[in-house]
Amino acid sequence: MTEKVRVHEIAKELGITSKDVVKKASDMGIEIKSANSSVSMEEAEGLMNYIMSGELAQSPTAEQKVQTKAPSHTPKEEDPTQESNKSQTTLSKKASETPIQHVVEKAKEIDVKNSEKEVISEVKEIKKEEESIESSELKKMQIKKSGLKIVKKKQPREEEKIQDDFISSVKQTQASISSYGKISAEVLEELANKKKAKQASSGAKKQEQGVKIDIFGASLSEVSMDMDDQIVLLDLNSTQRQELIAEEPRKPKVVKPAGRNANKKSAPKGRNVSRDKRKKYAKDKPEDLIVTHVEIPEDIRVYEFAEKLNRPISDVIKVLFSLGLMMTKNDFLGSDEIEILSEEFGVEVTIVDPKDAFNYEEDLAEVIDENATERPPVITIMGHVDHGKTSLLDAIRKAKVTQDEAGGITQHIGAYTIEQNGKAITFLDTPGHAAFSQMRQRGTDVTDIIIIVVAADDGVKPQTEEVIKLAKESKVPVIVAVNKMDKPTANPDMVKAQMAERGLNPIDWGGDIEFIPISAKSGMGIDELLENILLTAEVLELKANENAMAKAAVVESSLEKGRGPVATVIVQNGTLNVGDYVVCGSSYGRVKALINEHKQQIKSIKPSHTAVVVGLNEVPSSGEIMMAMSSDKEAREYALKRHEYDRHKELSHSTKSTLEDMTSMIAEGRLKSLKVVLKTDVHGSLEAIRSSLNELRNDEVKINVISSGVGGITENDVELVSNSENCVLLGFNVRPTGSVKALAKQKNVDIKTYSIIYQLLDDMTGMLMGMMAPKFSEINTGQAEVRNTFKAPKGMVAGCVVVDGKLIRGGLVRVIRDGVVVHEGELTSLKRFKDDVDEIGNGYECGVMIKGYDDVIVGDVIETFKKVEQKVSL
């Protein structure tokens, strides 16, 4: 199958827009519809030559067509020897005034009048020259695409014409003898003798390393060119080209007789027969080529910028130093530095977004044409936790979803499709718990109408306010469902007033928002709500093109046993079929199965319908866009580009830091950290829990999620926790198996599993509070004034009178002199006359001895107090 090249790849290679390439192609007669269209390698080569040179390729003349046509091997064909002679004669005439004449004369040294086999040897040498030239051209075309645009000096057209004539003549000669057998031993021996004579006359040369390759001992098809190793560039200046052509062609190498090198390993087949030539010109790398335009990403280091400009790093750093910028090669360049460097080096710099390389959503965007059909509306039910969102959906679907939810709260996004009056409606049920704000955000991204459920007896709550904010930002129509109207304490006017304060004015108050009283428990108002949904959808005129390539949004993803990575998607445009190749962020695959909300396998899903997709290579992130591709190769390329971008971004951020970042990193190092390994059943829960855990922190403690993933708890997770200090293993809606439990017991690892998210967060909060340093408050118990001092064998005794409260033995004490604290310590001895007492009340005299302190003088005030530990909180 002929290899294809996309138009936007040609545009990127040449540094121009895809629109210009399409225009040039139309001038050449090549029909191209868009930047994603493909052309053959021959058309791409001709198009690139036309854009670079500005001249259309000339059509071959009748004489050239006759000369380049390969003769068919029939009994009436002319003798191959005569045909070869004609080719060589024509070649000599054409190149009589150029350095190529030397090559042809060398090829004529073998007598071809009487030996048909010698002709084959001669043409084989010519073929060898041709292969070297063609491999050089191919190597030039295979320069790695890295955003660097190289401008080469344009060569005279006369030399290019001579080179093309030379190659076509050699191809003609090769074709004329392609059906003949191998060269005889006599000719082989003669060539070997000539080589030895030449080596003897030219003196001792540097010994070649490795084993010589016998190219005559195998058929022509067994000798292949190693294009990956070939580095000779054909696009040289005039002087270099003449030197290259005038170089004497090397003669065929023969295998040396067995000797001291006989035990060396033989060279593998398929090695490059022109390796010597490659070594000779290996220094001709494109280091001195002029760079006039370069495309760079927004985040680029100094050494990366130098590589793009094909300049030494020292030159770039020297310019930066001259500007007073002390930067190293690993520092990132800002927009100002890039602008200055581009002016200094005379290079036009274009800042490109690396996301464009894998922006398949924009590349494959389908325009919804006038033939698009009506699609069902997508409704997202949102509101505060326990306000009855899932119960409302139960009443609509006549199912009991709430009974299956742990703790009676929704912890996943549910997607369902129902029919009302013959029209389909798709519902998304989002969680109302505070931890699931990202899930609610994804719900607004794919919805057409938002239903905000508010309990009539509870009013507006924090998550209700968040939903109102999301609805205003997304500019999606809103319908307010006032639930729990069957309760005696229901107050719909209170709900309307609170919502009006936040910008959602009811229609009966002169606003534009429908407020519908309902009761999910009794079913009151459900039909009226559905009628309003259909009426609003009719006004929106929702349409989609069912015949387009499928585009779907991932609302949930997980790793299921027996199915692997799965994703719940809602189709936004086109039709997704079983067998389609899809890409979704950094994951890709082929749709093996589609499962609807009733656990039934279906063959396809149309716009605004939902299903579970099976067949991806890894669990995609929730909120990603899934697109259908024409081939597995195309899907894989987009996914790998996205993976490389994510990896590069992560590595860049790990080293990109400012002074403020360094200060915060030092502060982070002083925090006490609780390491967590987290495993959940679905990606949405993983995202919500990980985000909530990262918010559980203060200036003293924090949580560090060192590993997280979707799926069951494995032995690797247990090993990771056992090898980490101060680490816990958490599982949400997953349970460890027998072998994992045994390993955890052996490693003394405690596995904590949960099914309700707020229980997990409460436990983690308690663990963090236990890691915090205790806080104490002081309670003053009394004061005494020193009236006299006495020396005792164990220390100084202060005779005191209690003037406030009471003194307590064993408590803490501080000595105050002239209003200044001079010592804090412990009261070790308290006596009333000669008796030891535990405490002395107000107005009584006593003897006091302070541990380790004898510098008490008359007039000091001794104050006793105790510290009470306070409960800490985040």
From Swiss-Prot:
Residues 383-390 are annotated as: G1. Keywords: Cytoplasm, GTP-binding, Initiation factor, Nucleotide-binding, Protein biosynthesis. Residues 483-486 are annotated as: G4. Residues 374-543 form the tr-type G domain. It comes from the Bacteria. Its main location: cytoplasm. GO terms for cellular component: cytosol. Residues 56-71, 82-93 have a biased composition (Polar residues). GO terms for molecular function: GTP binding; GTPase activity; translation initiation factor activity. Pfam families: EF-G_D2, GTP_EFTU, IF-2, IF2_N. Residues 429-432 are annotated as: G3. Residues 55-139, 245-281 are annotated as: Disordered. The keyword Glycoprotein does not apply. Residues 408-412 are annotated as: G2. Residues 103-139 have a biased composition (Basic and acidic residues). GTP binds at residues 383-390, 429-433, 483-486. It is found in: Cytoplasm. One of the essential components for the initiation of protein synthesis. Protects formylmethionyl-tRNA from spontaneous hydrolysis and promotes its binding to the 30S ribosomal subunits. Also involved in the hydrolysis of GTP during the formation of the 70S ribosomal complex. This is Translation initiation factor IF-2. The gene is infB.
